Amino acid sequence: MKKSIYINGLGSISSQKTYDNTHFLNEVIHYNNTVLPAVSPNYKDYIVPSKARRMANGVKMGITAAKIALKNANHPTINAIITGTGMGCIIDTEKFVGSIIDNDEQYLTPTPFIQSTHNTVGGQIAIDINCKGYNFTYVQASNSFESALLDASLQLELNEAETILVGGIDELSDHSIKIHKKINHIKNAATASNQLLNSTTKGAIFGEGANFFVLSNKRQDSTYAKLLGTSMHNTLKKEHLNEVLIAFLSAHNLTLENLDSVVLGYNGDVEFDSFYNTFTSLLKAHTGILYYKHLIGEYHTASAFALYTASQLIRHQQTPEDIIKRKSLKTKQSIILLYNQYRGEHHSFTLLKSCE
């Protein structure tokens, strides 16, 4: 018999004030820009200041989001830490490469190099919470977080671990922003975030953030939802969305009729949001349609925020108006499906269910 997997705690650092788990999007920040920086908590509350000074923003976000998740789950013993990231600690990478050029490859400071690897966040979290177990980082572009989620799910189902910390983390950097603007992946003109669905231009608004989750095969008082499964597709044509969706739901003994809401990764790119329009055309009339990237921007592990959103919705049964594209006709949100893709590639489906 397949073991159940529960989301027992979560922590989020994003372009909204999500670091406070006492409420969920009660005060939404609206932006008019092309890049949305994360709203940081007081890092002194989570990281020793002498250590924080030497950390890049992405590392601080990751450690803090992880600690918030652990506190939210009542500080369980963690058997493994699995992270996903698209660009890793890119700020330190840029610092090190810049110093190579500026100093003619001599007298280099090693710190940026040591902290520039993609697994820096996972390693720093392990040191901080004294976890000596399995520690792995996935770098699979916009499927990075889902790869980490799938790994954790398999380990829990096979009893290789009892409680796992899983997260997605990506940070903004000046150089990467310039490159994405140059190739039109970021919009050329400032866009009002609350009007993103009406965008008629190419490119997205970009962001950064860290979202961590405590997964376990044991339910507890802090449990948010049950994770039924996740599926990834590197490439997927629009005309095949229907059969892939039906097959994914069928694998979990569900149909389109069972979906109470879907959480979609609309990012305002007129060229690729059509995937979501095709997807929504398949849904039943009672199924709610929700979106979130107008709140946090686009980045490789932005889909982790979708899991955070769906988990909050299932536990608290309250849907903030700012994320509703079409209101659900169901009185209770029991089954929620997440669908994300980036520029027509790296498609992912994740399914959550209430614990009742």
Regions of interest found by a model, annotated:
Residues 1-136, 146-150, 154-158, 167-356:
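Conserved "HGTGT" condensation-loop signature of ketosynthase/thiolase-family condensing enzymes
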Residues 141-144:
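Catalytic nucleophile serine of serine hydrolases
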